[in-house]
Amino acid sequence: MRGGLWQVGQSITRRLGQSDKKTIVRRWYASEADLKKTVLYDFHVANGGKMVPFAGWSMPIQYKDSIMESTINCRENGSLFDVSHMCGLSLKGKDCVAFLEKLVVADVAGLAPGTGSLTVFTNEKGGAIDDSVITKVTDDHIYLVVNAGCRDKDLAHIEQHMKAFKAKGGDVSWHIHDERSLLALQGPLAGSTLQHLTKDDLSKMYFGDFRIIDISGSKCFLTRTGYTGEDGFEISVPSENAVDLAKAILEKSEGKVRLTGLGARDSLRLEAGLCLYGNDMEQHITPVEAGLTWAIGKRRRAEGGFLGAEVILKQIADGPAIRRVGLFSTGPPARSHSEIQNEQGENIGEVTSGGFSPCLKKNIGMGYVKSGLHKPGTKLKIVIRGKTYEGSVTKMPFVPTKYYKPA
């Protein structure tokens, strides 16, 4: 879903060499000096972070561990990510729920206070502007996080519609949380590690839940969510306390939770079958085509009321022409835009994300194929650098998710 490798333009589960980094810098920025830095930048460098340009920021792609080692350690122990390049914001006012429901497909009104959900911002044609995790803090306060590469576009979209909504008497305002940083603690040790740093009982906080609590002396927005398929948390912390909190988390884990970069984050989300905006979802792809119909609330399916509802509800009723699928493939890992063919060699779609799975020890990917050819077990071919390799459609997630839910 989230924090995707938007500016890089393709999955980066492979390790980037210096020549790759220089190419990206030349493509997107005049120099390294143009890049924004999170408050943890010096902390990353001091801990061996290999910094690369991403969505206007200098971010760690990996640390001393290889991407494969970091991926496996997250599954077995835990990982700490700096995701402060993402944009957190709050919507407030008695009409904030009604306002947001004009822009997203979720049943925001149906969320209980202190709970949240993945949703999709849509355009007039039903395409995805961005995906986001939203939380209903109270009936008059919504907290959400949008992707770094979509920040300017998303904020302009929200502001445009907010002006029109307020002009009609709607009560809604917003605040962009630039004063906060965002950490993601993921993996089987996430809960026990964080519990050492707060007096709040986290054992009753389940996947999707939200709290505002004290963690290691800081007032934090805590959401039990993540982008890895593992149990974990996203922690919005005042920026002046972010480095100290990161150090405290690593210390309490006794070295088992490790700093992890964008490379492993990408392989983790791919193994979990999660969309990467800019690859697996774009403005011409609807939530139905992306396999996110489950994120469209039942009430919203009945009532509509969001941008592009006519297109999306018709697809739910009639079925979409294309569908996102999971892929296994032979040969080298498939990359974004690799052609997918049927057994007769006819084009039926393309790969949107792909790479080698550190946990499965095989090539995995996602892509879009014509409806009817989307069923698991369907044999197909994938064209990689001019050569054709055998592949097949498979169910997702590739690696079972381990979200913390009530027994």
From Swiss-Prot:
Highest taxon in the source lineage: Eukaryota
Supply the NCBIfam families for this chain.
Answer: gcvT, PRK00389.1
Catalyzed reactions per annotation: N(6)-[(R)-S(8)-aminomethyldihydrolipoyl]-L-lysyl-[protein] + (6S)-5,6,7,8-tetrahydrofolate = N(6)-[(R)-dihydrolipoyl]-L-lysyl-[protein] + (6R)-5,10-methylene-5,6,7,8-tetrahydrofolate + NH4(+)
Origin organism is: Flaveria trinervia
Return the Pfam families for the record.
GCV_T, GCV_T_C
Could you identify this protein by its name? Aminomethyltransferase, mitochondrial
Query: What's the encoding gene here?
Result: GDCST
Enumerate the GO terms in the molecular function aspect. aminomethyltransferase activity; transaminase activity
Q: Identify the keywords attached in UniProt to this record, alphabetized.
A: Aminotransferase, Mitochondrion, Transferase, Transit peptide
